[in-house]
């Protein structure tokens, strides 16, 4: 209700949210386990587990929605069941290995030193994600003010943007992992090379997929809806956000590298100021005077650009500091 969700969809939205949040423990455990595997260079198995869960999710969606006619509840149930499967697979993988990172449930205990390090990096990153999601909720509320058609168009377009983000987020995670590994062994030149290579991959992937989504956006949106009005709204949103999406990739890359070097607080603050601050300013100051979808979503590339400038400056300062430490 606070987000201004239209009356004709609020009950379904509430039902989906309540069921979906039941699966959060599975989602979190999968991410923890997948992070361990990626940290030791195993990126294939987390991907395979996700693919398996995705296939199960798609099949369950068809069964629960089409066969059992469960609607939104069926979609939510399929989602949390697929998250449960991915969680079980990754935990089983960690439990069955003979490597140093083997998960032995009987020996699980909290170690203060490691917990402190995890909190130092994890809490700022978690706060950053939470606050950014808050700004997205404000943007969703602004979209809702256009009615259920615009809301459906945004939801469909956001699914496509989710695929784009997955491609660049994987590069960001790789950058953070490889940077932390090289930082641990004091290989400064390799850290630079990791950042450059990841930047090329991120920009290249986002430009290819972004331009593809821009050109074929209307065709892809037909997967989600047959409504011409909804597709029109979705195309308008994609036309603003897809081509400059490489800015989002660059924006995430520098904080990833900084976290790999153990610096998490400052990137969080800069991301909150650049991304969240800019979007809040845009929504409450600029958007009320120009109430169109275009003027609302142009806040995306504007906030990405502002954040990049601050993150690059921060990275250069930290890089100089780390370089001086390594040369001692």
Predicted regions and their residues:
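Structural preference for long, well-ordered alpha-helical segments within the folded cores
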Residues: 58, 62-63, 126, 190, ...
């Amino acid at each position: 209700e606070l987000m201004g969700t239209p009356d004709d969809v609020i009950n379904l939205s509430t039902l989906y949210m309540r069921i979906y949040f039941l699966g959060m423990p599975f989602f979190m455990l999968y991410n923890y386990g997948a992070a361990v595997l990626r940290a030791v260079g195993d990126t294939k198995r987390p991907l395979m587990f996700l693919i398996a869960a995705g296939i199960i999710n798609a099949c369950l969606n068809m069964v629960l929605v089409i066969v059992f006619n469960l609607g939104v509840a069926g979609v939510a149930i399929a989602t949390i069941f697929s998250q449960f499967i991915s969680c079980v697979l990754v935990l089983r993988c960690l439990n069955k290995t003979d490597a140093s990172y083997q998960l032995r449930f009987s020996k699980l205990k909290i170690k203060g030193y490691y917990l402190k390090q995890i909190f130092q990096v994890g809490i700022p990153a978690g706060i950053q994600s939470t606050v950014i999601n808050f700004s997205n909720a404000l943007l969703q509320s602004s979209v809702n003010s256009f009615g259920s058609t615009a809301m459906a168009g945004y939801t469909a377009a956001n699914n496509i943007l989710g695929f784009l983000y997955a491609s660049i987020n994987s590069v960001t995670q790789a950058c953070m992992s490889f940077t932390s590994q090289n930082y641990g062994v004091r290989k400064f030149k390799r850290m630079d090379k990791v950042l450059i290579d990841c930047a090329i991959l991120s920009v290249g992937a986002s430009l290819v997929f972004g331009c593809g989504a821009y050109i074929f956006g209307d065709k892809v949106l037909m997967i989600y809806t047959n409504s011409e009005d909804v597709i029109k709204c979705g195309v308008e949103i994609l036309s603003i956000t897809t081509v400059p999406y490489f800015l989002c990739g660059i924006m995430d890359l520098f904080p990833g590298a900084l976290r790999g070097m153990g610096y998490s607080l400052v990137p969080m603050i800069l991301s909150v100021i650049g991304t969240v601050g800019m979007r809040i300013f845009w929504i409450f100051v600029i958007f009320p005077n120009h109430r169109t979808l275009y003027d609302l979503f142009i806040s995306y590339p504007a906030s990405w650009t502002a954040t990049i400038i601050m993150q690059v400056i921060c990275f250069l300062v930290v890089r100089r500091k780390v370089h001086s430490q390594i040369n001692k």
